[in-house]
Amino acid sequence: MNYITFRERFHDFACFSNEQVVAAFPRFDRGNYSTWLGKGYIKRLRRSWYAFDDVAGTPGIGDYFAGRMYSPSYLSCEYVMARAGLIPESVVQFTSVTSLKTASFKNDFGEFSYRSVKPELMFGYGVEHVGDGLPVNVATPAKALCDFLYLNSQYDTLEEIEALRLDADVLEEISRDSALDGVVARFGSRALVRRIKLVKEVYAI
């Protein structure tokens, strides 16, 4: 297949799956992927998923790929907590929550991890846009914190919560108007209620 024709069809999406390609071009030869990978036109994201090489410098492109190559999912936990200033460490791994099974991928755009939750816990996120309007699902800081504590059972003592070094000012901000309590209630988890109670005790919010 002519690469220029292929690029014109898919480049606006920055990445694509083999399923999408076959739907658009039923007689597509998968051998083209090897050729285009060898020429540096595209990069492999994961099995049957590829991205165009020239989008690498697009701000936020990793955020976008995180949601595209494993869906449904949304960015959450440490990645969003760091971005919101809730934890002091910078986080280079794209951490997401999904209703699919737990998974992880590594490619030229970064490391991507996905933690599995029940479908009914897939809430508390909104859509942001990067590049030329590419959509990204991102948890609110309150939901990111709750996802993190729900999925990491070791944070169950005052000492462990204190070791997170959460920013008290950011915590206070996300606790306003009962936003944090509302998220906690939707989980229906006694363990999460207990951990958030410890957070409030340690950071006096």
What are these regions (language model features)?
Residues 26, 85, 150-154:
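Hydrophobic/aromatic-lined pockets within catalytic cores
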Residues 1-72, 108:
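Short beta-edge/loop segments at beta->alpha junctions of small alpha/beta modules
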Residues 3, 18, 77, 141-142:
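Structural motif detector for alpha-helix initiation sites
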Residues 15, 111, 163:
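A residue-level signal for beta-strand positions that form part of recognition/binding surfaces
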Residues 37, 43-52, 62-123:
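Short gly/ser-rich loop at a beta-strand->alpha-helix junction or flexible surface loop bordering the NTP-binding
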Residues 125-205:
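Hydrophobic alpha-helical interaction segments
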Residues 28-29, 87, 190:
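Short coil/loop linkers at secondary-structure junctions
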